[in-house]
């Protein structure tokens, strides 16, 4: 499987880029098999694709807005998944729902034979990120509600309409191949992609292309700057007791959680500068006058390499065991999610850049620029030149 990532600024323009790239990705493989398609034919398809995708601007924006309106947290993307799979089914895609045992996960397929091109993008939102669209300051639709604060409402519109444009050309020109659409469910919780891989859903995929929003328009190859991580919940079991009447009878699970957190915070001094960790107490007991019999804490351990992630994870387990020993409680832990560091393909990155240059940057309006300046001021973002694309040099062998 090949993974590629590029940033998103304007959905319609990205759909055009996506389509152009997919044509380039599919046709060489077809040409090798059928000896049928020359460069001139490929270029003519690209020109037709530009017109095709540009005409779908309104539909793309409607999909972006609809997914934004759902604003569903990880593993709760019920309406989002129903909406997206409904559109795909109407356009001839076969849907497999509940993949990897995740109710809101699915995989959509159209076509047959090779090459098999998979397109993915995340669909979950962020807790307490409700925000009115087009407003450059905090103004929630519903105070405290979840919302799309990371652009996960944009990606599926891009890949779905790009895939539909590719499908049209494949049908028109009798081009064999398979298109696959999949969602990143619970991405904020690291909750699905590793399980898709584990269960073999990408086993026969020739290229997997992934889109995500960013601060500029381009694509990367090599190490893409994203850390890998492991998500772990540590749970402690003790004995309840009345905190005033008979505290000596209790074994506090909350004490164990707090001791683990204290121990880990002392460990931070000895971590590498690139190692990152965060935690939240997810269960701290019921009320102050009862010694908590159960408590839990949720950790993320992040780094750029598998070895350094593993070392943090191992240290966390040791500290948790020590906390359980000190409080005479029992500890168990559960891995909730995991992700390898991103390392993307050079050939796909260069092909994407070539097509980005052909399409060019979107034509920004005065309103676009005004909004951008307001957001930059709000987040104190450094000023950057307008970039058509970027390619990161690989920081380790391909």
Predicted features and spans:
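Metal-dependent amide/peptide-bond hydrolase catalytic core
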Residues: 37, 258-398
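Sec/Tat-exported extracytoplasmic proteins
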Residues: 53-57, 64, 68-71, 92, ...
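Acidic/His- and Gly-rich active-site-bordering loop/insert found
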Residues: 32-148, 157-179
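N-terminal secretory signal peptides that target proteins for export/translocation
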Residues: 1-12
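Bacterial N-terminal signal peptides
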Residues: 17-28
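Divalent metal-coordination and catalytic microenvironments
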Residues: 67, 108, 119, 152, ...
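Histidine/acidic-residue-rich, glycine-tolerant segments that coordinate divalent metal ions
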Residues: 138-147, 153-154, 170-292
